[in-house]
């Protein structure tokens, strides 16, 4: 049995519940998953409100965390996944994290800036649970100079604009957790890639990378 954290980005909202359904099906083989939701269009609205009304970074941060909770409810609805409001390994099946409550207790590793978004929350959760992290997004992987990288250290991506936020890269580097970035636009292909551990880009925190 394997366990991993799956971050599902808001960019996948059109197919995101199919991704969750695929995880639920995969969990019937004995695997367990903790889904960390993105912020989706709700977090985009928080950015707009901050720019328009000049709210503080702290307020925008917590509003964005609450936006993740809205997306969590969306992801769990009708998919067979269950909501959970604590950072813990599910005993079975698929759980979707409601992050506000556990982060209010302790979010010391998250700076309250837009460099630390839901990617950073997912990386923090993976670090706390010593678990692998998979980021489902709307690109084939980490793209540099027009090329999808098969594998790259987190250190090399710091300061570069890619599909994963800067805060997450710092957490990966500090914790040594790896993150597999996979294209989630085709849920069936995503699940197949996840099951095989192939495709996309492996961002290495520290230590060993892919075999073969």
Q: Language-model segments: what does each one mean?
A:
Residues 1-212:
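C-terminal catalytic "cap/lid" subdomain
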